[in-house]
C-alpha cells in the first residue's frame, strides 16, 4: 500500500550560546539531525520553540544545524520564538497547509505574546475552519505548539492550551481529521479522543519528565487513512 512519511521534532531551544536549560541544545539537535538524515522520509516538521530566546543569531545557528536536511522543512512558532525574527530566517518554511498525497497537514497558531500558555484567538479559529473547509485531502493532521489535553504527568497543565473546547468545536465537524500533533510539554505521549489520535512530541533538547533521552516522532501515512507513529530516542 502506498504511504508517505514525515518526521516531527519540537522544542529545540537553540540559543546564542550552546547551553540552555542546563543542556547543550546545539549538540543534542545535531545528534537528532544525524539520525533523521538517514531516514527515507518526505518532510521535517518543527512544532515550535525552535530557539530559546528568539534572537536572529539563534535562528541563523539553527539554520546551520539544519543544513544537512535535504527534505521539505516545515516550521511553526512556539512561545519562545519571536515571530519577526523567525520570519526573517525561516519565511520559506512557515506554513499553514502542506499536502502529502491523500493527506494534508494543517497548522494553527496557539502562541500568545509574552505568555507560556497557549490560546487560539477567534481569528485563528476562523482561519483554521476556513482551511479545513477548503481542504480536498482525504485525511487531515492538525499541528499546533501547545498540548490540548491533560498530560497526566508532572507537566503543569495550566501551561497548555487555555481554550481546547473552542478548538474541538471546530475540529469535531471534520471526520477527515485523523490526528492532532503538538510539542511544548517536552515529552512523548499518545492519547485518543473520539477516535482521533492526540500525539505529544518529545523535545530534542531535554524532557520534562523522568525520560533522560532526547527524541523525535516519525509518522507513516497510508493511503487508506492509517497512521503509524514511531518515537525514536537517542
Curated annotation (Swiss-Prot):
Q: Give the main EC class.
A: hydrolase
Q: Does the keyword Hydrolase apply?
A: yes
Which SUPFAM superfamilies has this protein been placed in?
Answer: Metallo-dependent phosphatases
Q: Which Pfam families match?
A: Metallophos (PF00149)
List residues binding AMP. 13, 49, 79-80, 186
> Which Enzyme Commission number(s) are on file for it?
3.1.4.-
Keyword line: Hydrolase, Iron, Metal-binding, Nucleotide-binding
Cofactor (UniProt): Fe(2+)
Name of the protein in question = Probable cyclic nucleotide phosphodiesterase Rmag_0669
| Originating species | Ruthia magnifica subsp. Calyptogena magnifica
Amino acid at each position: 500500500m502506498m504511504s508517505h512519511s514525515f518526521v516531527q521534532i519540537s522544542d529545540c531551544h537553540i540559543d546564542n550560546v550552546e547551553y540552555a536549560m542546563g543542556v547543550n541544545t546545539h549538540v543534542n539537535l545535531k545528534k537528532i539531525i544525524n539520525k533523521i538524515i538517514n531516514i527515507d522520509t518526505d518532510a521535517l516538521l518543527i512544532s515550535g520553540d525552535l530557539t530559546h530566546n528568539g534572537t536572529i543569531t539563534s535562528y541563523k545557528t539553527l539554520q546551520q544545524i539544519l543544513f544537512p536536511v535535504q527534505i521539505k522543512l516545515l516550521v511553526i512558532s512556539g512561545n519562545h520564538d519571536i515571530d519577526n525574527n523567525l520570519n526573517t530566517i525561516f519565511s520559506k518554511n512557515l506554513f499553514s497547509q502542506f499536502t502529502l498525497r491523500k493527506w494534508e497537514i494543517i497548522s494553527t497558531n496557539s502562541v500568545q505574546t509574552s505568555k507560556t500558555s497557549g490560546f487560539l484567538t477567534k481569528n485563528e479559529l476562523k482561519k483554521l475552519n476556513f482551511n479545513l473547509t477548503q481542504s480536498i485531502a482525504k485525511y487531515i493532521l492538525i499541528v499546533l505548539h501547545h498540548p490540548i489535553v491533560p498530560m497526566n504527568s508532572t507537566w503543569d497543565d495550566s501551561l497548555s492550551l487555555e481554550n481546547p473546547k473552542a478548538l474541538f468545536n471546530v475540529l469535531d465537524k471534520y471526520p477527515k481529521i485523523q490526528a492532532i500533533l503538538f510539542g511544548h510539554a517536552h515529552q512523548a505521549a499518545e492519547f485518543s479522543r473520539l477516535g482521533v489520535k492526540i500525539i505529544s512530541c518529545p523535545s530534542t533538547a531535554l524532557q520534562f519528565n523522568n525520560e533522560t533521552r532526547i527524541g523525535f516522532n516519525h509518522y507513516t501515512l497510508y493511503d487508506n487513512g492509517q497512521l503509524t507513529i514511531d518515537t525514536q530516542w537517542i
